[in-house]
Each structure stands twice: as structure tokens, then as C-alpha cells.
Amino acid sequence: VALINNQFLPYPYYAKPGAVRSPAQILQWQVLPNTVPARSCQPQPTTMARHPHPHLSFMAIPPKKNQDKTDIPSINTIATAESTITPTTEAIVDTVATQEASSEVIESAPEAKADQVTSTVV
């Protein structure tokens, strides 16, 4: 087995003299594909031809083009404002006019009540 190792060839090729081998042994030899270097050879420089899959940077999906060209304002969700507790007093008026499912006729006026509610707003 003679190894042809030329600096201009990207991969090593094996040359087998046919006159030395018998016809049965010649049929056993197969042509090596160019993408698989022999394991006994020194490592060759990495090229894209040796990689069955391209590098991940080549498989990046480009961003979709926005057809509307509408600008979305950025909202800062991490606010650094100081939180102060401000008590507020609100008047809540409940107007209750209930009519139950009965045969009674309700003749009274709807009740109105005002409650004072103190809430804490952050």
C-alpha cells in the first residue's frame, strides 16, 4: 500500500499497484470516498467539505421583516421608583334592588347605603 500524501490534495488517497495483487484481492479493494480520511493519517485542516452538517451559525434563522413598520414602544418593567403608601378614602355607594323569584310584590324603594372604605394604594 502506497500512501500518496500531497500538500495540494485535501485528503489522502491510497494507490494500490494492481500487478502485485491477485484478481481476487483487487476486487476486495474499494475506492475510498473523499469525505472520509483514513484513521491512520495525520489530522487534516478542518474544511467545510469534511463536515456533513454546516456550523450552527450558518443555520441561523433570519428575523422576519415587519411589513407594517409599526414601532412598538419599549416598556421598562423593572421600575426603580420608590413605593409610598398613600391611604385614600373612597365613598362606595351600593344600590340594592333585589327582586326574588316569589309571588310577593315588593313595594318598598330600593335601599341605598353609603360605606366609608379606607384602602391602601401602593
Swiss-Prot record:
Residues 38-57, 101-122 are annotated as: Disordered. GO terms for biological process: lactation; protein stabilization. Its main location: secreted. It comes from Rusa unicolor. The keyword Transferase does not apply. Disulfide bonds: none annotated. This is Kappa-casein. Kappa-casein stabilizes micelle formation, preventing casein precipitation in milk. Belongs to the kappa-casein family. PANTHER family: KAPPA CASEIN, KAPPA-CASEIN. Keywords: Glycoprotein, Milk protein, Phosphoprotein, Secreted. The gene is CSN3. Coiled coil: none annotated. GO terms for cellular component: extracellular space. The modification Phosphothreonine is found at residue 98. Transmembrane segments: none annotated. Glycans are attached at residues 84, 86, 89, 95, 102, 118.
